[in-house]
Design a protein with these regions (language model features):
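A cross-family structural signal marking well-folded subdomains
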Residues: 17-20, 26-261, 389
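C-terminal, well-folded lobe of enzymatic/effector domains
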Residues: 166-188, 231, 343-402
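Betabetaalpha-Me/HNH-type nuclease active-site subdomain
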Residues: 214-364
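Charge-dense polyanion-binding interfaces
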Residues: 22, 27-50, 305-332
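Short, small-residue-biased leader/transition segments that mark boundaries at the very start
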Residues: 2-7
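Glycine-rich, histidine-containing beta strand-loop boundary motifs that form or position
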Residues: 15-18, 330
Length: 402
């Protein structure tokens, strides 16, 4: 059968996902032949295989993502308690053993629970879902773009238990926004360390499951996140440094959030639209206003006030937030002069330089001069905006509290 044969086709080391599937199909075979009964009508091997494939389809085809789901699922629900009462925390190394113990409950409950979990996890990744509101889906997509994946342990638990927890769409949305603000600070400052995050979210889940009904879940989440969040001083310092070299992906995210904050339906641009190119995955990319190459073009040497000043700016300011923006198809801007970057058009006559309609570029269009002082000024202004946008209050969730 397809179930048995595709396990043996590949001569590569089996992943955790493959090994767990093998255990599942072996148990389904035993149950079906009647040598091992769980008291329920057994699931056929074919049906078990089909349901397993459905679960994987919900998770997408990246094996690392599939494995991450199994870890997060275990840490959110801890489906099997250890006999001596110790709590097992799922890691890459013990995953197969933990899921072996989970399978002992029988194939049917294992697959049913896992499929419910996979549906919730898919919703947490921002895939279209009936389980949550459209607004929450949009917010969850944003959280993933802010590299907030470790928060999915909590979201998985909340989406599966939305009904029993009496969690409204509105409060779920607040929690996703709290997580986004937390992860923006975390990923820009590096605090708290990545290794602490998994256990922290597992503990938040435990706290919620043991809390009195009248406690607002967003308050539990906010209080825990605030205890470990980077303060404003640290956040400012990290935002004011060579942010592009420290974390280009997060730089792209915060530039996009600054631009998105002022978008209306009429002026909407999808800054996350994908291209088919490996090198430039996004249609909109980060543009250095003062070019980042070692050979400074003549027009820029003049604009910076001479060779020495230009070299200093290259060493000290080129990768700072104030010198960065977003443009579409930026390969064609590169070393052009400031004037040309402002007014550049594509072959069909549309502005694709700084006159591209994004609010973060409007101030650039209004000036004729760009130098180190301008970079410093614009950095300070954007940092102020970001500290407000991802404030400690928004992590506390207090912005949405009555």
């Amino acid at each position: 059968s397809s179930a048995a044969s595709d396990v043996y086709k590949r001569q590569v080391p089996l992943s955790a996902i493959d090994l767990i599937k093998n255990n599942l199909l072996a148990l389904a075979t035993e149950e079906e032949s009647g040598s091992k009964g769980s008291g329920q009508k057994p699931v056929t091997v074919e049906a078990a295989y089909a349901q397993w494939q459905r679960i994987l389809n919900l998770l997408g085809d990246n094996p690392a993502n599939q494995e991450r789901f199994l870890r997060y699922y275990w840490n959110a629900f801890e489906p099997v308690k250890a006999s001596d009462g110790t709590r097992n925390f799922a890691t890459k190394s013990n995953l197969i053993r933990l899921y072996e113990s989970y399978l002992k409950n029988g194939v049917r409950p294992f697959l049913e629970n896992l499929e419910i979990g996979a549906e919730a996890y898919s919703a947490a990744l921002g895939e279209p879902s009936e389980l949550i509101s459209q607004k929450a889906t949009t917010a969850m997509k944003r959280l993933q773009r802010a590299q907030g994946a470790p928060g999915n342990v909590l979201l998985l638990y909340l989406i599966v238990n939305k009904g029993t927890l009496d969690l409204t769409d509105e409060e779920l949305l607040t929690i996703v926004n709290q997580l986004t603000a937390f992860f923006v600070r975390r990923n820009i400052t590096g605090r708290p360390s990545t290794s602490d995050l998994q256990r922290m979210f597992r503990d938040i889940v435990r706290q919620i499951s043991g809390a009195a009904c009248e406690t607002r879940i967003s308050e539990i989440v906010g209080d825990r996140l605030l205890k470990v969040s980077a303060d404003d001083l640290l956040f400012r310092e990290a935002l004011s440094g060579p942010i592009y070299t420290d974390n280009a992906d997060m730089t792209r995210f915060i530039l996009a959030s600054l631009a998105e904050a002022n978008m209306t339906n009429e002026s909407f641009s999808d800054l996350w639209a994908r291209t088919s190119q490996q090198k430039r995955p996004y249609a909109w990319s980060i543009e250095h206003i003062f070019p980042k190459g070692e050979n400074i073009p003549e027009s820029w040497v003049a604009m910076m006030g001479g060779a020495e000043q230009a070299q200093k700016a290259l060493e000290n300011h080129v990768h700072k937030l104030g010198n960065l923006t977003l443009t579409a198809n930026n390969s064609s801007l590169g070393n052009r002069s400031f004037e040309a970057k402002k007014n550049h058009k594509n072959s069909s006559g549309h502005y694709i330089g700084f006159r591209n309609g994004l609010s973060i570029n409007a101030p650039l269009v209004a000036i004729d001069q760009w130098d180190a002082n301008r970079i410093i000024e614009r950095t300070e202004m954007l940092v102020d905006d970001l500290v407000r946008m991802y404030s400690l209050e928004s992590i506390a969730g207090s912005a949405g509290r009555p």
